[in-house]
């Protein structure tokens, strides 16, 4: 992953090619495995309470370790998938960029790049074109439910990708979003309650291994770093009963 992020040749490629390269490198066969594959690649994924205004963020540490931090507010599995792909885009495209130093226009530009990367990454063009050909009424949000289950991506994201590929007319696109708004699908889509939200497991498993095998007693860690249990739980997004 580090090599992908620091490969200067990537700057000469378009986002779709970079997304295809990343998907192949991570061996993503289905988006249902996205979180697992990201953790397997070396990315540390954590959950934290970041309030309602922040969905997720990502960073490279000074030791060149990639982290993705997800908000733990109630959110659908498909929206979490998009957050993960969006943050992967930042890790690969915007390596070590100081976000605080960017102008408003610069920040808007890199956010669009991360959004576009996520769409290309989650919905590979060739396969998506084949699957979309079965859609009969493209302006009807309910027509996208089978694709939502297959790709684990929101109805809105599916239609947007299709529209950008020229598969819907302007009028069809406008009618689609009018229907989406009228039915309240901007906030809650069909199937959102049926698709289980997968939580990060890598860091939890490492900590569980450390404590169960007494590699480092919990008290020793707390005393060494002068922290209390609640801080450690908050830092790694753990439940009260985990430690």
Which residue stretches match the model-derived regions?
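Active-site hotspot residues in diverse enzymes, especially metal/ion-binding acidic/histidine motifs
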Residues: 1-243
């Amino acid at each position: 992953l580090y090599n992908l992020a620091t490969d200067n040749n990537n700057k000469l490629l378009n986002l779709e090619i970079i997304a295809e390269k990343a998907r192949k490198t991570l061996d993503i066969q289905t988006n249902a495995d996205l979180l697992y594959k990201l953790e397997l690649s070396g990315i540390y994924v954590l959950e934290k309470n970041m309030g309602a205004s922040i969905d997720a963020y990502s960073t490279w540490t000074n030791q060149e370790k990639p982290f993705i931090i997800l908000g733990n507010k109630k959110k659908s599995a498909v929206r979490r998938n998009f957050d993960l792909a969006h943050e992967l885009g930042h890790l690969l495209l915007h390596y070590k960029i100081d976000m605080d130093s960017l102008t408003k226009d610069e920040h808007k530009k890199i956010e669009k790049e991360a959004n576009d990367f996520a769409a290309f990454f989650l919905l590979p063009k060739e396969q998506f074109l084949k699957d979309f050909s079965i859609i009969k009424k493209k302006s009807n949000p309910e027509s996208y439910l089978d694709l939502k289950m297959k790709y684990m991506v929101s109805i809105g994201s599916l239609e947007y990708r299709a529209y950008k590929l020229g598969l819907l007319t302007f009028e069809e696109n406008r009618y689609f979003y009018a229907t989406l708004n009228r039915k309240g699908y901007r906030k809650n889509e069909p199937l959102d309650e049926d698709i289980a939200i997968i939580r990060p497991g890598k860091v939890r498993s490492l900590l569980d291994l450390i404590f169960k095998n007494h590699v480092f007693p919990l008290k020793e860690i707390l005393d060494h770093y002068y922290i209390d249990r609640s801080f450690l739980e908050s830092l790694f997004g753990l439940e009260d009963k985990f430690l």
